[in-house]
Amino acid sequence: MTEDWVPKTKLGRLVADGKIKTMDEALASNLPLKEPEIVDILLPDLEDDVLEISMVQRMTDSGRRTKFRVTAVVGNRNGYVGIGTGKASQVAPAIQKAINNAKLNIFKVQRGCGSWECGCGGDHSLPFKVTGTSGSVRVTLIPGPKGLGIVAGDVAKRVIELAGVKDVWSFTKGQTKTTVNFAKATYEALKKTMYVKR
């Protein structure tokens, strides 16, 4: 897919020319990430997971139009994670759109060991407590000691696993049955780790 890729953005050209070799450099450049191929090149070990496929219907003059809405998460299980949604009249294109959008929303999770029960100084957990919200859903992630695992609902667990966080407690409020909001709230909580407390 990336062999015949012709970059359209400045960041894409820098990556294609080999001037930017890592995802860290790409994000530090502050150039907008608008091409999923950039992520494919810089993070070849990226995995994706479809969290939800739902049907959305809309009434038009010609009748009822049905589309599929897909929510997907991507991550390399080593600090990078992104989430995205995609809509299309067929399932396969909707999945591809969601995965591409997730790649464009990728960021680096700041990992650490913020658990008072552990204090090993490793990067198996989070450096401090973080909270994220989306719609009615509020997710709080708390650093856990080594060996705890991910204590979270299924959707949040899949997002956290792909981010490469191994030990964490979580508390949720709101309609966690709404997969999109549950996933986005978890994503927003992880994003807060970028703003490290000094």
From Swiss-Prot:
ATP-binding recorded as keyword: no
Entry superkingdom: Archaea
Pfam families per the UniProt record, alphabetical: Ribosomal_S5, Ribosomal_S5_C
S5 DRBM domain boundaries: 46-109
GO molecular function ontology, one term from the record: structural constituent of ribosome
BP-aspect Gene Ontology terms: translation
GO cellular component annotations of the record: cytosolic small ribosomal subunit
Keyword RNA-binding found: yes
Keywords: Ribonucleoprotein, Ribosomal protein, RNA-binding, rRNA-binding
InterPro entries: Ribosomal_Su5_D2-typ_SF, Ribosomal_uS5, Ribosomal_uS5_arc, Ribosomal_uS5_C, Ribosomal_uS5_euk/arc, Ribosomal_uS5_N, Ribosomal_uS5_N_CS, Ribsml_uS5_D2-typ_fold_subgr
Domain notes: The N-terminal domain interacts with the head of the 30S subunit; the C-terminal domain interacts with the body and contacts protein S4. The interaction surface between S4 and S5 is involved in control of translational fidelity.
Subunit structure: Part of the 30S ribosomal subunit. Contacts protein S4.
Function: With S4 and S12 plays an important role in translational accuracy.
Family under the similarity heading: Belongs to the universal ribosomal protein uS5 family.
Protein name as catalogued: Small ribosomal subunit protein uS5
Species classification: Archaea, Methanobacteriati, Methanobacteriota, Archaeoglobi, Archaeoglobales
Gene expressing this chain: rps5
